[in-house]
Amino acid sequence: MICFEIKKIFSKTISRILLIVLLFSLVISCYFAITNITYIDNRGVSHTGIAAARNLRKEKQRWEGVLDKAALQAVIDEYRKVNEEYPIRQGDYTANLLHDSKVQGFSEIKDMINMGFCEFRDFNYYRIDSVSKDEVGKLYENREKSLEKWLSSEETEDLFNKKEKAFLLERYHQMKTPLYYEDYDGWKSALHYAQTIVMLVMLVSAFLVSGIFPNEFSWKADSIFFSTKYGRDRGTRAKLIAGLIVVTAIYWMIIALYSVIVLGCLGFGGGNVMIQTGFWYWKSFYNITYMQLYLLTIVSGYIGTLFCLLLSMLISAKTHTAVVAVTIPFAILLLPLFLSNFHFLKGTLGVFPDQLLQINEIINIFNLYQISGKIVGSIPIMMVIYPILSVTLLPIIYCTYHKTEIK
């Protein structure tokens, strides 16, 4: 019966078209992810693609290793040498590209120095110009001090209480330093488009599974289905399991293809590098590596997708129509945009299911909650709550459809 339900899902023309659209979107996303890496040659000409990623990796290999005081001082020396030979000129695009070609091998380390010696809520691209060799060794210490200074300002009085401030400072202090650096462009690029892939899979899957329970009603065969010996129990169970199989299979097949293609082309190296190494996640209080962040992103994406689609299946089982059920994932994605201006909903929106689909972005946000006197971030909470809610929805869906009354 399960196989029959799965066949019914894919027997529809719209389902096949949606799968083709999803595969096409996968190809486009892989293309953008692979060409997201830019390498500038000695003539100042920009290149993208697999060869560009390979050449850029060679440039960055020179700076691979532990970013201790000596390594940071070497970056300062090299940057000043480049500045003397290839100075940045206002309005001179070609000259500036030549400058960028000489610093691209250590640009992420340069960004770390810029971030580390700016105010917490500020960024100065040229801050490295005024950082001394003796001063640069205090990079990691400065990271903690800038957070402490910001938390002590009037700006944060209404944002965090004393426990939350202490929690953030403790997490910053717990980061093991000095950080290790190597090229992690493959993981960074894969993360950049993973969110798009996850959302596309969820929206396409919504169209596929929303018709599982209403099918018999749209075909005017509901009286036959529910009057058969096993219709209400085995039939309902088969529909539910078929939906779970379809959602799970499509999600992990697409994610696996995306991961293998992008990381296979750009390289798997750098997975053990801490996410604070560089510009994007320098301020994050989650002390994890790029590989861990990627795994967290796709696992949380699956949890969020599964929850949204189970909710969609529940609506379809209750209303006997796919039209309303299809709108559920769209509503979950769009609703926070309309409610974000309501300050009193900030806590709720911080753990709304759409957040699971964009972990690589919210990992930079200080969404904190107090549970039994303990401060925790929003991500651990969602990773516990939504699997439980998803499991809870299963018997509710079954009972809702099982008890359907025939009119």
Predicted regions and their residues:
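Aromatic- and glycine-rich beta-strand/loop motifs that create alpha-glucan
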Residues: 1-16, 22
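Alpha-helical transmembrane segments of multi-pass membrane transporters/translocases
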Residues: 11, 15-18, 304-312, 367-407
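Residue-level recognition of pore/gate-forming positions within transmembrane alpha-helices
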Residues: 22-26, 242-243, 330-334, 390
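Secretory targeting signals
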Residues: 24-81, 136-216, 237-318, 338, ...
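Transmembrane helix boundary and interhelical loop/hinge segments in multi-pass membrane proteins
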Residues: 209-224, 228, 232
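Short hydrophobic, aromatic-rich alpha-helical segments embedded in or entering the lipid bilayer
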Residues: 347-368
